[in-house]
Amino acid sequence: MSEESDSLRTSPSVASLSENELPPPPEPPGYVCSLTEDLVTKAREELQEKPEWRLRDVQALRDMVRKEYPNLSTSLDDAFLLRFLRARKFDYDRALQLLVNYHSCRRSWPEVFNNLKPSALKDVLASGFLTVLPHTDPRGCHVVCIRPDRWIPSNYPITENIRAIYLTLEKLIQSEETQVNGIVILADYKGVSLSKASHFGPFIAKKVIGILQDGFPIRIKAVHVVNEPRIFKGIFAIIKPFLKEKIANRFFLHGSDLNSLHTNLPRSILPKEYGGTAGELDTATWNAVLLASEDDFVKEFCQPVPTCDSILGQTLLPEGLTSDAQCDDSLRAVKSQLYSCY
C-alpha cells in the first residue's frame, strides 16, 4: 500500500472527531495579525481586544454596517474595520458611529478630503510643516512633529496644511502598532505671528477637533507644545471649548523649557532642534514614505463617492461639522480673541 493511502487510513477524519476535538476554524486569509505578543497583551488590557474573539467582533461590526447603512460606500475588510473597533475599545455601537462619522466628515469637507494624495501636497511636504520622527516614544507612540512657522500663508491656504495632517494620519493608522499604541503630537509654535494665527479661526478649529475626536480612528495620547509665544494663549482659548476633558488633559505646554519636554519625550528620540541626540530633524524620509503611497491614496480618496446627505445625513456629523454658520470665523472676531493675550 502506498504512503499516501497509509496516511489517509491512519489520520482521523473530521467526521470521527467529537465536537470538543474539532480544530478551531482558520482565520480568513484576508487578515493576518502583525502584533507582537507584547502588543497583543497591551491590546487586551487597554482596548479589550481578545484575539480569540477578534474576527467575531469584526463580523459583528460588518453585519451592523450592512444592516443599518446598506448604501454606505466603505471598505468592509477585516483590517479596516479593526481600526474602528480598536479606537473605541471594541464597543460595537461606538465603533459603528465612528465609522459613520469618518465617512461623514470626509464628504462634508471636500476642500480637505477630495483628491487627498501625496503628489497634490508636494508644496506642503517640501515646506517642512510636518513630519514623523523616525523613533517612537517609550510607549511605542509615533511622534508627529508640526511646525506652523514653516507655513507661508501667501503660498497656499491653511486647508492644505490640514490636508497634509490627515494624509499623515491616514498613513500612520495603516499600522496595527499605531492602532494600539496611538500617537503623540509635538507642536512647535516658534515664530507664529498674530496674522498667521488668525487663519486658524473657531470654525476651522472646531472642524479639525471634531474630526480628530469623533471622526478618525486614532488614539492621541499626548500633545506637547513648545516655544509657544504669548499669542498661543489666544489660540488655545479658541481650541479649548471644543476639546473633551480627556483630550484637554493631554495637552502639555512647555514654552522654551526643553527639560520639561524631555521628562515626557526622551532626548534619545528627539532631533537636536529640540535638545535631542537623534541628529537633525529629517523631513525627507517621511515625505518619501508618503509619496511612495501615492497609489493607495488615489484608490481611497480620488474616486467619486455619493454625497453625504444621500447616505448618512447631516445629523450624524460630529459637532462642528454641521453648519458653517455655527462659528463666526471672521478675521475681526479671531483677532479680538488673540489681542486679549497682550
UniProtKB/Swiss-Prot annotation:
| Keyword Cytoplasm tagged | no
Residues covered by the CRAL-TRIO domain: 117-282
Domain of life assignment: Eukaryota
> Biased composition, Polar residues: where in the chain?
8-19
Q: Name one GO molecular function term.
A: phosphatidylinositol bisphosphate binding
Q: Which Pfam families match?
A: CRAL_TRIO, CRAL_TRIO_N
Q: Where is this region: Disordered?
A: 1-31
Q: Which Gene3D superfamilies match?
A: Alpha-tocopherol transfer (1.20.5.1200), CRAL-TRIO lipid binding domain (3.40.525.10), N-terminal domain of phosphatidylinositol transfer protein sec14p (1.10.8.20)
Entry GO terms, CC: membrane
Write the record's keywords in alphabetical order, separated by commas: Transport
What exactly does this protein do? May act as a protein that binds a hydrophobic ligand.
Looking up PANTHER family in the UniProt record yields:
ALPHA-TOCOPHEROL TRANSFER PROTEIN-LIKE (PTHR10174:SF130), ALPHA-TOCOPHEROL TRANSFER PROTEIN-RELATED (PTHR10174)
The protein's name in its UniProt record: Alpha-tocopherol transfer protein-like
Organism of origin: Pongo abelii (Sumatran orangutan)
Q: Write the lineage as a comma-separated list.
A: Eukaryota, Metazoa, Chordata, Craniata, Vertebrata
Q: Which gene encodes it?
A: TTPAL
